[in-house]
């Protein structure tokens, strides 16, 4: 980028060619080599593929070839890849002799060529057949490996004892093992038939060939094992379908990663037992540190970036038909959830816009269909919620609401078995049960004793017992029959007894099983009929709708060869014997590794594991278990999977099992053991972190030499929004005065920070505002105060402006605590608000009336009188702790601490254990070396004890506050003052160095008993306190915070200080494993609320270097010295350098020393270590001094031109350092704060809002059913809307137009953004004087008398022409009505009507269009470039701009232009018209294809009246994409042009005739003018216009992609009549602006102008005065293709108006003709007001109109005036009155006005304006963005 910027700066100088000469010299030689080595003509789509493969091809070859891509790859393989591998004498096999001679000439190591004729086609390739095998140690096999099996390769090595290394080229598509469709169809295609793969290179069928289907198996093996030989197989390179394979002997097979011995064919697999978790962790850690242990052999291949779609429910789909491009999937996923309304046809329309792109040619139609079908799942959303601040009870309720089914499932076994186990535990009832014996002298039941003794005589169930003697029974019968038994008493008699539980259950054998079944039925019902749990829904949503990137990869396997097979089909003769005649036996087939398994979903059962080849030995997998069950297999194999993996999950497919061969042993053979069980995966000790974030803040040395982009403004970050983001308080008509805090306008004794919101003084009585719907705050206050809600609302309207009571926030969210403060002021009360984050006070602090209100943040947020039932849980909300609240309230010099909240940090056992282990082993810290202690355990013993405690410790949470900021911002001082307050007395300080500890002690001056609180980081671990402050946290080992939390059980609050930009800790021991932990910078980044981006230390010059706010009054300096100044402070790069300087008498420390501040300037030594400095250390070195910096030493290292240290070089040359580029992973994410916090807002808002999208559930359920649409679909058809997303916040009236009627292919082109442009603050100009013009003297010409002789009698057919033997029809007269003269007035000028004149467009093509000679794009010539540059300089001269200045791009303004452009495109045509033109968004319509059609018009002007046949104006119909993409660019340019345009240059775009007249009166003078109207202006603009337009866009930093699109379109336009050259097309975006700018640039190139007034409108122009011509004009005129029509006159005509210093007047000659035409064709009623308005512009000038118009046109002016006086109503003739309009009539008109434009509003008198504003329901009616968009003007941007 630095070189590019330098070259761009030299564009306009003569040094550019000399500067670019080295670039050209460096390009010439590679380009020559490329054209010489790769001369073939390549398709343009192939060049990116070749470059990505590392093949240096220029793409400029011209030699044709049937398959040039393969030829280029083959050439690179032979003459680049193999050329470098032939280091010893080598042999080449299977190569044409001519090709071998070229190869040997390039590298003499290629010494031997061996060819074998194996097929009939080999006769043409090889002149002879070799009789020997390779004799060299290195052999190259050219494009033949796919025809050989591993057994044959083993025989080749056996027959060639000297052969050690075999390099092979293999041509096979890697994706052929799972599909028969190519992933690169533009490079190759293939077809699988049986066991044959038919390969077709680049659709060249003559060059196609067949190869075995088993050939891809060469890409899946890592070694070939035979009883006598072991060969390794390695893939060196891959270039699409071409692979370089290395086969070499002498290397053993790769050992297994498992602890088990490898399984041999004669050894059954040993059973494995699952290890415990500790053993698994131990094994994982051992594997982690044993670097020499081999890893799992994986191989991957480059394929298009794609994702794998999930399987359809209960349906199987091939993997190939579920692969879609990742970019398309992500874009469609976002699109279906971003549109306001989603129709069922919208996904198909979006897919259609992508499916025809050439880069997506590999995607199958089935895949596109599956993608659009899957995308209708847009209504599905993850059912998640984020309740961070809920109470424990609320969280518990939410937890049970989400997981109650899991708990019910866990309790089901107990509930179902408990009734069945009840008979086993038949205990008596735990409490006695009452039993009634008698009542009112009647026996109800007998006593228990008698009941047991006499069962046969008493009622009730018999209880078996021992029978009594017979005489006792007889005695009982006798007494009972004679009524001699005692009579029961009257009162009830009750007996208590404990019965068995089973006796209480009726029919327990039936009831208990039924009860068990009943208890299990809810779980069964929920499992089969209810939806999935929230966790299952969440997991399945992300699993299926967020698929990971698909990768073509698999695990390499070993291939076992039991017996070598002959390499050749015919055996070669022995060296001393004749060649054998008998052929060798046929070798067995090379069994392919099975095809990849298809992924099994939850809806389909798992598939059986495919049977593998009997010769493949798989290494055991230890990282991922196979998802399939093991099964018996007829081979000696280890379990593995050769399946290709997509992201993390395997995708199995069940292929057909290959047929057995005679070499395969039978399945029952004892040598075929079954597959081993799968090995469980090993746990990962160190989790994988984000790869995009480095583990260290140290950048590579190369990064230090980068020149970053421009430094952004230090105020680039927007300030926080105000408390009223939706209300235009400043424009509220019900208030007066400035915006001030509430406590200033209404003084009272408020609670702190409760009345800080802004408001204004109300000056009108209460308005009748509607009662708010979300009024829970009013309800609570009403119940507490006793006042009705209507009284409260009325009282608020008496003190607050209407804009604060009725706005989108109140209507959508509810009332805020600002309203509560106003109520407290009105009723002199105070409110205590209880919220989850704390207790807040509002209102009058001295009031005796105190109300209590509770606030719940929701959703929805709500004010209530009673709190929700909630319990307190420790650490549930860290901000609610006592210490955190005190820290939030602490102020020092009126400033709060720079943080907004505390975070709950949970300690990590892994981090703490890593650090304590390194400390115990002496790798980090020095305490482990201290083995002696005067009393108690030694420090080493304490570390050992702490290490053992960490082993059994559990994670715990503490509150954490992070104070971060730039060097010298003052992080430490406020914390020191905080610790001196009483709530923070129990603290301790942990510092990284002794010097820093001494500084803390010096600043805080502790007493003797508190000195222990200040310690270094190691000794601090052995102390305890409630509060821990860690200074310079990033200079401490990783995991120190976690270890400190676990080492101190009394710790409750941690405050960490540090700057993430100043680097972090690096251990000096090479054995320390602390660096394996993730960086603390990125771990603590989420805890940084505010980054203090200011400095009190560094001087102003250093601060400007970094773009930091400086509070140091010293200007400072950066200088270079030749030697060290005496008594100076010196910073060095290394410790040994510092020691050397100290020995020489200088004060020296290393650069990495932090928290060091020098009052005087210090030096920075530049030496050989400077290039190794990290940006962090460079930042520290530059920010140590309050005065300045000296550089000494090797100053070349910090030179501006060729310095190797970027930061030092920028400092020395007084440049700027872009911290975002220096620290790209840190600085952009820091929440920068530019001033201290001086107020904290405690503002709450209540209300509810439904933000979930509305889903058409009926349509969603019927997607699988046939769809019946009406025969004619109306534009408002909404039955196919699937999802509707609501508006969360915003105006009730959506400023965006409906897009439901747009075609599905056009809807993705609309961004549908919300406009955010503020209201315009422009004011209309008021004339100082209001002169009344003198009434003109009207001549006595009547309209009818002049019209009767205006059109002479003539034959219209004589004006027609013949085109292709067909007469034109521009002067139709048959059946045309007329009354003014002898013929129809329409014959005054030709009529262009394509519907009735088929010759109109063909006859106009020659004059209106210019064509290219061929279909090749137009090439910008050097002449075009020079002329375009000159025109751009002239245009900049006209605007007073610097041609070399480049303005930064403003994305916010550009998005506003997108909104305006979209609005204009949707509102300029009816919905029916847009639907009818749906083909404009057809994806099959090329962007460069333009449809030309004729414009229908009856153009009447001076040139066309009484003229003959004229060519029509052509319009260009472009693709909707062009209009919607380049339209905002032109509107963006218009904004800057309108701001920069000088007042003496007038553009008529968007101006009214009255404004034209006013401008002429202000700027024009004299009586000499130059008018010009070009001939064929659009067709005369060639390539120079394209250059001019591109330079205009580059000046505004328009994205290059849009500039290139514009240039490509202008040079490649193609129409139905042929390709067009560069020309202006009416209908392209920005036609008027570009034409006007081109015209202005030509005028400033033609004349030497100095403030001359100029009027420009497209090709029309008027120049005031007679300026001298430019000296360069004669040369430039020859280069231009324009045809001028220059006229020097005193009455210039501009856009149909005569202009003069007295104003402008409509040309009465053309207006008279138009009135004649509309009178004859009866269209006067429709056009009269328009013509009257045009005429009134000149008429209102009074008698000056005679000076404006030429004298010969005054009769027509009189006739037109006569016509309007006799044909207009009195109300219409007011426009012709020179007197002002009566105010009463204006006020009557205002009462009927619904909306007014800015132009209309500016003409109204003051009283009418006030009335219109008072009646307006909009905050700013006349300048509202919606009104401006309706006018299609950029009025808000005019200022």
Swiss-Prot record:
Q: What is its EC number?
A: 2.1.1.-, 3.4.22.-, 3.6.4.-, 2.7.7.48
**Molecular function (GO) terms listed?**
ATP binding; cysteine-type endopeptidase activity; mRNA methyltransferase activity; RNA binding; RNA-directed RNA polymerase activity
Q: Spell out the Low complexity composition-biased ranges.
A: 600-614
Region Disordered: what ranges?
A: 253-277, 578-623, 645-703
Tell me which residues make up the RdRp catalytic domain.
1567-1673
Catalytic center residues:
776 (for protease activity), 862 (for protease activity)
Could you describe the post-translational modifications of this protein? Specific enzymatic cleavages by the host yield mature proteins.
Give the transmembrane ranges: none
Q: Does the keyword Nucleotidyltransferase apply?
A: yes
Question: Which residues does this entry assign to the site Cleavage?
Answer: 871-872, 1246-1247
Q: What is this protein called?
A: Non-structural replication polyprotein
Q: What is the species listed in this Swiss-Prot or TrEMBL entry?
A: Eggplant mosaic virus
